[in-house]
Amino acid sequence: MSCFKQDVYNCITPKTLSFVKSFLKQRSNDPAASTHLSSARVVEWNLNGIEVDSRARDELKAAVNILFRIMKYIGQFPFPKLSSKDDSEIISLTVQEFVIASVFISGRYRKLFGNDNGEIIWKFLFIALSHQSDMNFFEDDLDHLFTIPLKYPIEDGDSIAIKAQKVDWGGLEIIKKLSNLDMNQLQLQPSLFLNLTTLFLLTESIPNQKHNKMHDQFVHNLTTWKDFRKYSLDLLRYMNNDLSKDDLNSQTLSWSEFSLGMNNLLAPFVEVNLRKVVENNVLNISLPFFETSANSKMDGTGDEVPNGATTGTKTTMKENEGAGVEAQSKEETKVGNDVESSFGSKLVSISLIAYISSMLRGIGSTIEVTRFNAIKLFAGLEAGFSIRSLENKIYKWHAPTLLFVSGKRIKQRTIDTNRRYQEFDETYPKFFQANEDLLKSWQYTNDRITYCVLINQPWQNSNKKNFGDEKSLILSLEPRADYYTSLHSEILKGQLIYFNNSGMGLGFGNAQPLNKSNNKKYYPGDVSLTIESNLEFAVFRHLGSLSTNATTYFNRSRLPSTVAHEDFEDRFLITDLEVWGIGSKKELEEQQRQWKWEEQQAEARQSVNIRNMGEERAFLEMAGLVGNNGSGGSL
C-alpha cells in the first residue's frame, strides 16, 4: 500500500488513542487543541521554588533534554530523524511525537511489531545518544509516497483503526534498515547516558503511588542528585569498567558493550524507569500540554500557560475526575513526613537502596527491596565491630537480609606493618605470585570498595556446616556494578554461607575453614567473599581464567568486558559493616514487638538486680568480705 507520511502516522495512533487520552487529560479530539512541549518548560515546571545546587540543576536539564531528544527521534517513527547535535538546544515535542514515543516507551509497540523486534527501542536509544547526524533513514518529504507492507488487503470502507491492524509493522522499511545496520560503527557518549541513568535511578527510588506523592518525592530526592549520580556511574561501569568520572566526555561506549550490558543487567532498570518518567508522569511531562484558546496566558519564556495556572506557581495533575490542571501553593507541594531523607545510616541511603533494587530487578531476583521494607539490624559503627554483637543482632531475624561491607583498598603500608592483617594473610591461601601486579587496569589504590550479600535464609551458627540456598547472591556495588549468582547444584544446594563465631568470621562461597589448636586456614571458593573474625579485613576473590581445586559456589562475572575471564581480588580494610532485614510490613511489626518485649525484660532484670544489691552487700559485710567503706574487707 502506498501512502504519505501523515497517513502512516495516523495508522499508528489509533492503537493507543484511549491510553493517550487518559494520560494527557485531553479535553478535545481537535488536533488544534494542543501544541508543542519544550524540554526547558518541563525543567522549569519541576524546579520552580526548589533549592537544588547548580550542578544538579544543570544535569537535570541535560537529562530532560536527552530524554526529549530520544522521544523526538522515536516519535518520528517510522521516519526517524535526528535533531541538532547541540545538547544545549531546547528540544520540543509535538503531541504526535509524544504519542508515538509513548507507544514505544510503554512497551505497546510489541503488539504491533511482535516480540522478535524487542531490541528496536534500544537501537533507537543508542542512535539518539550517539550524535550521528547522518543516521536519518528517509527524506524529509511530506509529499513523497511510501510503500508499507500489509498483512491483509485494505478495503474502501476500512477505518484508520482497521487499517492499522492490517499493516505488517514488522515488515516496514525502517525495521529492515535497522536490522541490517552495522551498529558498531556508532559510539555512545557515556556523559549523556550518565545524566539519563541518574534521572532513572532517582525515579527508581520512588514507589508507585498517587501521582502527587510520586512527584513530591521526586522533587525531594533531587536534593541528593549527586548521590544518585555516583551510583549511576557504577551502573554504567557494568558496560565498561574503565569509565572514569574525570574523563567521561572523551570516552565512548560501543554497541556491543551497550547491548550486552542491557541484556545482562540494565534493560529492566531502563525500561521500567523510562516508562515511569513518561507514563506515570513523575516529571509532570504532560502538564504543559494545554488548550489553545483566548483564555490561555503567556509566561516570560514565550510558552503558553495552562488555564487555571499562574506563572511561577507549581502545578500538579489532579488525580480524580480528569479535570486537567489545578494550581497548588508551595505549602501544598512540600514533601510530607512520609518522605524519609535518610535511614540513620552512614552507609545505606535511599539512593543505595534504589541502586540495589535496580540490580535485583535486572538479575531477575524475586526479592524486592524498597525503603519501606528494609530495617537496620546491625551497624558496626553503632554496636561495635564484634562478631558476638553481630550474632546477637541478626540471629533473631527470620526473613531475608542484606549484608553490606565497605572499606578502602589495602595499601602497601598495611601489608608491611599491620600485624593483624599479616596474621589473616597467613591463613588466607595466596593465588598470585609475589612479583605479580595485584591490581588490574580498572582497580585503583584509592578505591572505595562495597559489596552486598543477599542472604535468603535466616542466619545460623555454622561452625561445622554451611547454610543457605540458591537465592543467595553477591552484588558488587563500588567501584563498579557486578553480580555473582549462586551456582545451581543438586549436591551443594546453595549451602555456601558460614557464620563462624569461634575465630574464623564469615564466608560466602567458601568451604568450611580449618580451626584446630594453632592451625587455622581458609578455603575460599573461586568466587567468594571472606570477612575475618574481627570484622576488620575482607577479601573478594574472582578466579575466571582457570578452575582451581576449590569448590565453586558462585557463578563468575557476566561482565561484557574481559572481567569475566580475569583473576583478581579486592582486599580492603573494613570501615562500615551493616546488616538490614528485608520483610513484609507484618514481619517488620512482629520483629519490632519482639525487640520491645526483650528490652522490657532486660530492664526488669536490671531493676531486680539493683533492688537486691543492698541485701547482698549486707551479707558480704557480715562475712567480713566487704568493708563499710566499700573498698573490700579483711580476713
Swiss-Prot record:
Concerning InterPro entries, the annotation shows: TLDc_dom
Domain spans labelled TLDc: 346-583
Q: Which UniProt keywords apply?
A: Cytoplasm
Q: Which GO terms describe its cellular component?
A: cytoplasm
Q: Which Pfam families match?
A: TLD
Where does the UniProt annotation locate this protein? Cytoplasm
Which stretches does the entry tag as region Disordered? 297-333
**According to its UniProt record, where is this protein mainly located?**
cytoplasm
Provide the function of this protein.
Answer: May be involved in a process influencing telomere capping.
Q: Which family does it belong to?
A: Belongs to the RTC5 family.
- Name by which UniProt lists this protein: Restriction of telomere capping protein 5
- What gene is it encoded by? RTC5
